Amino acid sequence: MTVQTSKNPQVDIAEDNAFFPSEYSLSQYTSPVSDLDGVDYPKPYRGKHKILVIAADERYLPTDNGKLFSTGNHPIETLLPLYHLHAAGFEFEVATISGLMTKFEYWAMPHKDEKVMPFFEQHKSLFRNPKKLADVVASLNADSEYAAIFVPGGHGTLIGLPESQDVAAALQWAIKNDRFVISLCHGPAAFLALRHGDNPLNGYSICAFPDAADKQTPEIGYMPGHLTWYFGEELKKMGMNIINDDITGRVHKDRKLLTGDSPFAANALGKLAAQEMLAAYAG
């Protein structure tokens, strides 16, 4: 006998009118163990360059019916790329717009993963005690030790980051100083911070989570309502080209901009980023 799981969003009792994804959607799109593999970097980087992670610091995303989606950064999209980069020799720092702790979608945490969970525990303090992004931006110059900026996905990236002048300044610094920018799924929504000023990403191609897929997720209770705007439409308006219209785990490199389409791309993006950064900094 097959037990049917509910497609109704689950109540988040920590906030009024807030909801987690339905049991059904979690059964389809999350797993207690990740697909981490291919972590093989026999000649890791030994220098001072590191990664700046720009993380989400807000949990609740309003939808079109007034209900709140309980979100944050997706753990797989955050931790798998970082696992590869760390294994390749690159340490990382975490910053949020407010300087307050990173919010994670804990309902997507691979809690039985014997590699990812110890890695998360080892670095949890960085996410709990991030730097304030404005302070990081104020210190940036051509000699700064950040080799890359990494913006993880999760719908939490839609909150605050697309309007942040500090996010814009960090991205402008990275592109103009020949650093890497790494992102996946909803993370590229942060690139919208560039739309009202100098936009060095104009003309770049990326993979990202398709707007069409976001429009379907309320049907299975992943979100409690529809989004009030769609980041893919807005990225196209600012001159970016989204090369995927589905979710296949695809990754893409355009110069030093490295992107993936979804959590299914997290492992491949980690491999790509580690290989590209080793070639640039340890070659």
Curated annotation (Swiss-Prot):
Keyword Hydrolase: yes
Swiss-Prot/TrEMBL GO biological process terms: DNA repair; methylglyoxal catabolic process to D-lactate via S-lactoyl-glutathione; protein repair
Domain of life (superkingdom): Bacteria
InterPro entries xref list: Class_I_gatase-like, HchA, Prot/Nucl_acid_deglycase
Entry annotation: catalytic residues: 185 (nucleophile)
SUPFAM superfamilies, per the entry: Class I glutamine amidotransferase-like (SSF52317)
Catalysed reaction equations from the record: N(omega)-(1-hydroxy-2-oxopropyl)-L-arginyl-[protein] + H2O = lactate + L-arginyl-[protein] + H(+); N(6)-(1-hydroxy-2-oxopropyl)-L-lysyl-[protein] + H2O = lactate + L-lysyl-[protein] + H(+); S-(1-hydroxy-2-oxopropyl)-L-cysteinyl-[protein] + H2O = lactate + L-cysteinyl-[protein] + H(+); N(omega)-(1-hydroxy-2-oxoethyl)-L-arginyl-[protein] + H2O = L-arginyl-[protein] + glycolate + H(+)
GO MF term set: glyoxalase III activity; protein deglycase activity; thiolester hydrolase activity; zinc ion binding
E.C. code: 3.1.2.-, 3.5.1.-, 3.5.1.124
Induction comment from the UniProt entry of this chain: By heat shock.
Keyword Transport attributed: no
Binding site for Zn(2+): 86, 91, 123
Assembly with partners or alone: Homodimer.
Job of this protein: Protein and nucleotide deglycase that catalyzes the deglycation of the Maillard adducts formed between amino groups of proteins or nucleotides and reactive carbonyl groups of glyoxals. Thus, functions as a protein deglycase that repairs methylglyoxal- and glyoxal-glycated proteins, and releases repaired proteins and lactate or glycolate, respectively. Deglycates cysteine, arginine and lysine residues in proteins, and thus reactivates these proteins by reversing glycation by glyoxals.
Name of the protein this chain belongs to: Protein/nucleic acid deglycase HchA
Organism per entry: Escherichia coli (strain 55989 / EAEC)
